[in-house]
Amino acid sequence: MSATLFNNIELLPPDALFGIKQRYGQDQRATKVDLGIGAYRDDNGKPWVLPSVKAAEKLIHNDSSYNHEYLGITGLPSLTSNAAKIIFGTQSDAFQEDRVISVQSLSGTGALHISAKFFSKFFPDKLVYLSKPTWANHMAIFENQGLKTATYPYWANETKSLDLNGFLNAIQKAPEGSIFVLHSCAHNPTGLDPTSEQWVQIVDAIASKNHIALFDTAYQGFATGDLDKDAYAVRLGVEKLSTVSPVFVCQSFAKNAGMYGERVGCFHLALTKQAQNKTIKPAVTSQLAKIIRSEVSNPPAYGAKIVAKLLETPELTEQWHKDMVTMSSRITKMRHALRDHLVKLGTPGNWDHIVNQCGMFSFTGLTPQMVKRLEETHAVYLVASGRASIAGLNQGNVEYVAKAIDEVVRFYTIEAKL
């Protein structure tokens, strides 16, 4: 029996995003560009450790009480409490009324996993709606917990803009009380965010059907460089849904603190206004603790301590804000550089959507065929959907990338005419 025990296990394809990283690493060509994985790079194409993070690490190491002891099951309180403040805002009614539950998670993915486990236990029959397109891992996270997913229109490819009517129609047609996963800012993969006015329409529509909103907040500070501006959608949702349904928030510090490998994040839940919250809050917290205990026992401490220092030390907080502006402004600069090079080359099509988008990514509009040719002919690596990590561009490679895109677009434009 032991010889055949695993014979029926299916071989799965490599993860789409990490597969790109692997192929890029194996590519021996002298000139190559990785626009696949979502990680910030400086203008030399190197990983950047934020100055605020370096300073926080020094404080931690110089502390006489520094140790590697276990954290509690729900994480480091100085992280979770301060993380909640930057996403909800200290003036939020949810804070004033003690309606917020916060636990530490393994970055944003871990927070989404906690959400999925919670939904599967308490709301197993609710549909989970994801934007079309969405982050490649969203569907798997929810479906692996036995939840059913559906999609709502988001990206209008013809106009390279938000399909607001399709979005609102999907909200109205969804079964009452469904779960809508919303990207709070710097939408992945499109880089296209609703305007403030559009967010009001979206949240009002969600409230009218008693839906549950889950905000995936992976890029706070990356869309505009301003934490408060990037928290607008979450704060609006908490305000407008306060008497309708709880609001779930999955928060990551991978991007805005450069803590990719340390897996620092938080799961937050803003409860509705109701008299029973004095009993509901400890009950829900106990269930979240049980999920965490059975999965990871307790969350990792080192990265959590670093981010906590950023959030609770005024001079480090100030430097961190400057660091976020440094990253977001360089990405914006690269958006304009890429668009300008394409315009200068006369590349067929309109490329203004690149500068109209925000955050780390651009949904370029390139087809899977074009992306394949970019990789095979020019060693420029993108996700098959056409998503490009603008953070991978710099002064030394942006012109090369523009020329590669120009060649590929012209190749398929000419081929289509033959």
Curated annotation (Swiss-Prot):
Q: Does the keyword Cytoplasm apply?
A: yes
Required cofactor(s) = pyridoxal 5'-phosphate
GO MF, one example: pyridoxal phosphate binding
- For the modification N6-(pyridoxal phosphate)lysine, the affected residues are 255
Q: Name one GO biological process term.
A: aspartate metabolic process
* PROSITE patterns tied to this protein: AA_TRANSFER_CLASS_1
Query: What's in the keyword line of the UniProt record?
Result: Acetylation, Aminotransferase, Cytoplasm, Peroxisome, Phosphoprotein, Pyridoxal phosphate, Transferase
- Reaction(s) catalysed (UniProt annotation): L-aspartate + 2-oxoglutarate = oxaloacetate + L-glutamate
EC number(s) from the headed UniProt entry: 2.6.1.1
Localization, UniProt: Cytoplasm; Peroxisome
Enumerate the residues binding L-aspartate: 38, 135, 188, 387
Q: Looking at its record, which EC class is this enzyme?
A: transferase
As stated in the Swiss-Prot or TrEMBL entry, residues carrying the post-translational modification Phosphoserine are: 389
Major localization listed first in the record, in broad terms: cytoplasm
pH dependence statement: Optimum pH is 8-9.
Instruction: Provide one Gene Ontology cellular component.
Output: peroxisome
Q: Which InterPro entries does the record associate with it?
A: Aminotransferase_I/II_large, Asp_trans, NHTrfase_class1_PyrdxlP-BS, PyrdxlP-dep_Trfase, PyrdxlP-dep_Trfase_major, PyrdxlP-dep_Trfase_small
Positions where N-acetylserine occurs in the chain: 2
Asked whether the keyword Transcription regulation is assigned, the reply is no
Q: What does this protein do?
A: Plays a key role in amino acid metabolism.
**Remaining remarks:** In eukaryotes there are cytoplasmic, mitochondrial and chloroplastic isozymes. Present with 7700 molecules/cell in log phase SD medium.
**Subunit structure, briefly?**
Homodimer.
Q: Which family does it belong to?
A: Belongs to the class-I pyridoxal-phosphate-dependent aminotransferase family.
* Protein name per UniProt: Aspartate aminotransferase, cytoplasmic
Species in which this protein is naturally found: Saccharomyces cerevisiae (strain ATCC 204508 / S288c)
Task: Provide the organism lineage as a comma list.
Answer: Eukaryota, Fungi, Dikarya, Ascomycota, Saccharomycotina
